[in-house]
């Protein structure tokens, strides 16, 4: 039997532009603007590197991490907060730079929309962990690492905690798939 071999391939990577976001005004989910446990606003715009995907044209979707947890307040739960996970819709526009510029393009970014992540079925949370925005038909996820029912297995499909780590748009463009670092999950959400 012949031994199989695999060939490693590499692709060159070129930095072509650097963009910036103005995080001072927060994201578009103004209903979450109240202070989190660590004192930061619940609609802080940042950390959008957990997932980025091209949707179409110059539209991109990005997932922030489970919320702002760089401000220490409770190391027992990794300083995670009750931040409601979300994804953002951005317009990114490249414009050619002059030949003398350090990078070939400049990048303009504009936040168009913020979509909070929720389920129609009641999610399970730790005691007193349900987000205050929940209503009879909308159950929001939470970025807090201890916001789950410990009596249920970690594979429980309605676990209320969620740490988004990737995003992909469906072929029809109507849905997104988002992976969860807290469990072996990939969720489908409407756009």
Q: Model-derived features: where do they sit?
A:
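Sequence/structural signature of beta-propeller domains
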Residues: 2-191
């Amino acid at each position: 039997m012949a031994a199989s071999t695999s060939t490693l391939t590499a692709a060159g990577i070129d930095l072509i532009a650097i963009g910036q976001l103005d995080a001072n005004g927060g994201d578009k989910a103004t209903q979450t603007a109240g202070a989190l446990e660590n004192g930061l606003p619940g609609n802080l715009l940042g950390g959008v590197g957990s997932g980025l995907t091209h949707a179409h044209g110059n539209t991109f979707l990005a997932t922030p991490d489970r919320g702002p947890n760089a401000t220490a307040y409770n190391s027992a739960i990794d300083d995670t907060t009750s931040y409601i996970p979300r994804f953002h819709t951005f317009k990114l526009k490249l414009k050619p730079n002059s030949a003398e510029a350090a990078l070939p393009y400049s990048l303009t970014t504009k936040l168009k929309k913020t979509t909070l992540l929720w389920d129609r079925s009641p999610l399970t949370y730790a005691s007193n962990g349900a987000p205050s925005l929940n209503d009879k038909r909308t159950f929001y996820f939470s970025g807090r690492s201890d916001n789950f029912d410990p009596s249920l297995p970690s594979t429980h499909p309605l676990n209320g905690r969620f740490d988004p780590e990737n995003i992909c748009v469906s072929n029809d463009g109507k849905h997104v798939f988002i992976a969860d670092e807290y469990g072996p999950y990939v969720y489908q959400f409407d756009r």
